[in-house]
Amino acid sequence: DEVFGGKQSHYWDTILQNGAQYQYGEVLEDANVREADYANLFNSSSPRGGGITDSSYGHEVRNAVQFKNLGASHFTSHSKVTEDKTVNWVESHDNFANGEANIPQELSDEWIKYGWAGVTAQKNGMSLFFDRPYKDGGTYGTGGVGTYGNGSGPFTENSKLGDAGSDLWKDPEVVAVNHFRNAMVGEASNVSNCGDDNCLMVERYAGSAAQDGMVVANANGSDKNLAGQSTKLANGTYTDEVTGSTITVSGGKVTSGTVKGQSIAAFSNKTRSGKVSTAEAYPNKGTIPGESKTITLRSYQSTNTTYSTSDGQSGSFKDGDTIEIGSKAKSDEVVTVTVKGTGADGEA
């Protein structure tokens, strides 16, 4: 505990005893900051552990994906805190908003997903996925891409406070990696490259085909044939949640199976549907200032999307379309917007 003027503080002893299952804190890295001590403090204060944000690890991962390199060492570099007590990310809200190394411009959705696969498929650490604003973009300042100053930054004003952000977290590859992580709790992990630094493989294994699996991020422009690749997985056949393709393992080697170019595969025998579909309208509540209010209609992996309003409007829409409501509304009248669609699995 910290000591001030000869008096000992019991702040942490008091505040952390709150019944939470898992707790973590953000420690701003600087000289003489006791990251390991803070991580141990949080980890010992909750029954399911805890830790701190590992900003230096995130920086290493961003360097890798920003410069299009999936070398395994970039995803195993925890220098200040043991990996079981870390909270990890590809990028945080600060990295995105503050213009760190031109990140908003230079990190595409594709490479964010590769980074997420490498971070999240592993055994240790807790992962956080930063959901960028809807239709993010823009440049920093007035000097063009990469400058920081008086410009709009990466925010394009397509969303307002309280609106849903990017749909990337619903992407089937992101969802499959999340499912994989949850299914592999407690199993050992191994991170390696499959032939080159643009193909990253995270294996999880416990000794049987019913338990084992691997996530492969293939950033190459062509398919990656995994035949001959050494593996710790048990003998058997494993199915990719995203595409349904399979790999076969025998005697510590992959004997057959490929991963499509520029894609992520999550092979296991614990697969489940990774399809997420949504139809939404934003903002989803509030008052109507002046004569009308603009509503943005959103859809993701949905077809036959339609809208109707209680003030008499209706029609079909595609993601990003806008409508105006309230022009005929009386004072204090509530205007309701209803959106519908057919999901990727055929559900209404």
For the regions a language model picked out, list residue spans one by one.
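Active-site-proximal helices and loops of the catalytic beta/alpha 8
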Residues: E2-S273
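Low-complexity, disordered linker/stalk regions enriched in Pro/Thr/Ser/Gly
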Residues: G274-A348
